[in-house]
Amino acid sequence: KKLDIGIDLELFRQLTITADYFNEKRYNILLHREAWPESLGYYTAKPWSNKGKVDNWGIELSVNWRKEFTKDLYVDFRGNFTYTENKYVNLDEPVYPYVWKTSTGKPLSRTTGYIAQGLFSSQEEIDNSPTQNLGSTVKPGDIKYRDVNGDGKIDGSDQVMISPYGTTPRIQYGLGMNVTYKKFDFGVFFNGSAKRTIMISGISPFGQSDYNVMQF
């Protein structure tokens, strides 16, 4: 089901405006049955089902202004703006022990991770804090993470949605200009995005060592 409402305007034979609002409800999306009892023997081979539901909505706006100074010289200015949101409505999820592990009702593109509470300042603080078994030996200067479920250890159960934004930007925009004189044309265009979260993890200054920033 999709609703699309659009408006096109032209003013003074120079300014054109196009605006659109869309609202799409997608259903019958093919996915694995996650809420499937292991007792049925399908733990490693979960059946497929058309139970997925996703909502998408947003707006699109474009503006163009053209000014003719002479029959040989004219200028164009243009801009565009797009804002979109979405969320999972149904994923056939199992009943998780912690409500923050569910994806239903949350954006498709979001960022999950551990909640940082500063840095460890001493070995004594490490010894008196929840155990962090995240692949390396914890030392003073390492990041201290929150024990969200209070079980005395930091593991995957403590990962939560730390940002409603993911790698897909919710906002995209652009600005451009063209100047035309006879057979010559000059143009510039700028574009950008916003409401996006990326994890900067491709470059690690400490390699695979066990050291941290306070030891370099």
Predicted regions mapped to residue ranges:
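Short, glycine/acidic-rich beta->alpha junctions
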Residues: K1, D55, Y165-G176
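Aromatic side chains
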Residues: Y21-F22, Y114, F120, Y145, ...
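Glycine- and acidic
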Residues: Y43-P47, Q159, R170
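C-terminal beta-signal and adjacent terminal beta-strands/loops
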Residues: R26, E85, N178-F216
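Extracellular/periplasmic, surface-exposed regions of secreted and cell-surface proteins
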Residues: K1-T111, V179
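Conserved small-residue
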Residues: G52, R66-T167, G207-F216
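Short, surface-exposed charged micro-motifs
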Residues: G6, G135, G176
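Conserved active-site-proximal loop/helix segments of enzymes involved in bacterial cell-wall
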Residues: L30-A35, G156, S204-F206
